[in-house]
Amino acid sequence: MKHPLFNQKVLAGFVSMLLISGSAFASNNEKSEMTKPKGAVGTGVALENQARTNQFWWPDQLNLSALRDHDKRSNPYGENFDYAKAFNSLDLDKVKLDINALLTTSQDWWPSDYSNYGPFFIRMTWHSAGTYRTLDGRGGAGGGQQRFEPLNSWPDNASLDKARRLLWPIKMKYGEAISWSDLIVLAGNVSLENMGFKTYGFAGGRHDDWEPDMVYWGPEIEMLASDREDNGGKLQRPLGATHMGLIYVNPEGPKGVPDPLGSAKNIRVAFERMAMNDEETLALIAGGHTFGKMHGAHKPKDCLGAEPAAAGIEEQGLGWKNKCGKGHSEDTITSGLEGAWTQAPTKWTSLYLSNLLTFEWKQTRSPAGAIQWIPTDESLHKAVPDAHVKGKFHAPVMTTADLALKYDPEYRKIAERFLADPEEYRLAFAKAWYKLTHRDMGPSRNFLGKEVPKESLIWQDPIDDKTQSNIDADGVQELKAQILKSNLTVSELVRVAWASAASYRHSDMRGGANGARIALSPQKDWSVNNPAETAKVIKTLKAIQEDYNDSLFSKSKVSLADLIVLGGTAAIEKAAKDAGFTVSVPFNAGRGDATQAMTDINAFSLLELTSDGFRNYFDAQQSYKSPVDMLVDKADQLNLSVPEMTVLVGGLRALDANYKGLKHGVLTSTPGTLNNDFFVNLLDMSTVWKKSSTDGIYEGFDRQSGHKKWTATSVDLVFGSNSELRAVSEVYAFDTSKQKFVEDFAAAWTKVMNLDR
């Protein structure tokens, strides 16, 4: 189904104009003299005077851009800007008063519905936070990505460009003290409070981005298309929405078919992938649809201009210009659906639930032609006041997705329970809204402001503060000595420390070494972590921990989380010494331990790695990209640069830290020592590489004798094959770079160990 809001004709016309007219830098005569290779088809011209990426010419070329985006130089505040300090200096009450005043001050250029912008801002907030997905932690409110393409031009975000412009005077007033990402969420909270709802809390602390995130939003090349399910109907990993350009599901039904039960299946999958259970899902949909209305006064194709990304420069970043009627107010067009769900669209009530469950509904179409539902009882058709025209009334409406909550048995049970107990319903929506808008912020230590709830919720991955280490430098040295005297090898210590810390995801700041959850379910049982080896290492480290903490001479305590990291630190220093180098790996104590009761097994299971190229692990059944692409994806989640990724792979191979001790890529005769052999031997021209009979495995032979020397995976060989990675690998293969390699590895290792702090 093509969505009328994404103006394909306008976009095609824009591109055609560029193709035909060229740029200001190429004359018609110059273009007429252009030639193309013999046998080539088409014009041979894409966009004149535009550089093309390597992926344009070679689509299978490894793309390293994710490891170079969000450069610090993009931030106009500069590297020394302290957002936490700026936010904490803010008088939040004054900001909220200003937002409240804005809500009921209608602007002529975009008048408010029902004389209140609250419902509009709630939609803006929801759609900012609602892109979050659990499988890779990407999306969410953090960064204020709704300001940038593609999100600012998604069909589901139609008209939200105006919502952000309405907020601009407040942003301009408070400047850098409140980020766009925080302001967008705060505006939604204040809107709820303005309309009589008691929210659960609000936390600041979201940093703004200054460029679009590189996120895989789906395989489709047209907005509103849906080609992301396998033959069994399962949604492709790691996606959460069912259509390109939608936040969740098609409100008219699966692929536009008005099937409430089919819609319920889509809703359940989409919200599960956003970390919401059935109760939270029901509360969010019902609570959100208590407010405001949908807009489909006319057919979009007859009235709307291009989305912001395709609109003319004179529109100044706004899109969807409406040429019909007033162009706003009662002529507003967004989704194409039209009408309000309740009789009081600017008040917190249970009317959505009572309407949904009590009324019988019949299918109809909006003025824009979208499928929707109205009550069969015609006496209800004048129950809802018009948003702009005094004295005019309408029927309440529901979408197919709304009716899913009535016809799905499990959702209906929850809806009936909430209707019978308004306070349970209110609290469920309050907590679900708080989770929705804060899910991508990581642990509660990242939360700022006086409205942060005192309670630490399980989805925030809490840690027992009482277990935090307080060991000093002498204690660190004593513990390192005890670890190295144990029966644990360098490789075992490195593997478990890496497994603990590398569970971190920069996208939603979850995982990491803090909490020592590698000793708990489900992380201790993940295949990538080699459960038997992990159990052995944890058992030994716990014994060392108990001896140290129970010692009469010990004035300090050490957590298991710190001891796991310290084990890796000690192992690396020993491995460097065994290779003839001296390096001091920084270690900062203070981590604490979590308990099993503090760990949401279902939510934490979604962090399980299906691929970790740093350990040469790849699950072909569960991974959604090639091994080398998954390596880059993981490096991106660890916030690594290209050199950091490179030196870590080379060092971990030298340390024999592969999954289950596999020898692929261990290009050294001294495994377990820290040296640059991986790079030296990978770039050695006396070795010729060939595919083996085992899929994904390569064999390296001596070019003269034919003797097999090594085995490797594509993750190993890409550092010699890819021109950019080879350039970095060459640096670490220099005879003069041996000490540099060790120091750079130690620095990158330390960075990973501390990502969650």
Swiss-Prot record:
GO CC annotation, single: cytosol
Co-factor: note: Binds 1 heme b (iron(II)-protoporphyrin IX) group per dimer.
Gene Ontology biological process terms in this record: cellular response to hydrogen peroxide; hydrogen peroxide catabolic process
Listed InterPro entries: Catalase_peroxidase, Haem_peroxidase, Haem_peroxidase_sf, Peroxidases_AS, Peroxidases_heam-ligand_BS
Cofactor: heme b
Gene3D superfamilies given in the database record: 1.10.520.10, Peroxidase, domain 2
EC number: 1.11.1.21
Cross-link annotation Tryptophyl-tyrosyl-methioninium (Trp-Tyr) (with M-274), location: W126-Y248
Signal peptide start-end: 1-26
UniProt xrefs under SUPFAM superfamilies: Heme-dependent peroxidases
Annotated positions binding heme b: H289
PROSITE patterns from the UniProt entry: PEROXIDASE_1 (PS00435), PEROXIDASE_2 (PS00436), PEROXIDASE_4 (PS50873)
Residues under site feature: Transition state stabilizer: R123
Keywords in alphabetical order: Heme, Hydrogen peroxide, Iron, Metal-binding, Oxidoreductase, Peroxidase, Signal
Catalytic activity, reaction form: H2O2 + AH2 = A + 2 H2O; 2 H2O2 = O2 + 2 H2O
Pfam families per record: peroxidase (PF00141)
Cysteine pairs bridged by disulfides in the record: none
Molecular function, one GO term: catalase activity
Assigned protein family: Belongs to the peroxidase family. Peroxidase/catalase subfamily.
PANTHER family, per database record: CATALASE-PEROXIDASE, HYDROPEROXIDASE I, BIFUNCTIONAL CATALASE-PEROXIDASE
Functional note: Bifunctional enzyme with both catalase and broad-spectrum peroxidase activity.
Subunit and interaction comment: Homodimer or homotetramer.
Official protein name in the record: Catalase-peroxidase 2
Gene encoding the protein: katG2
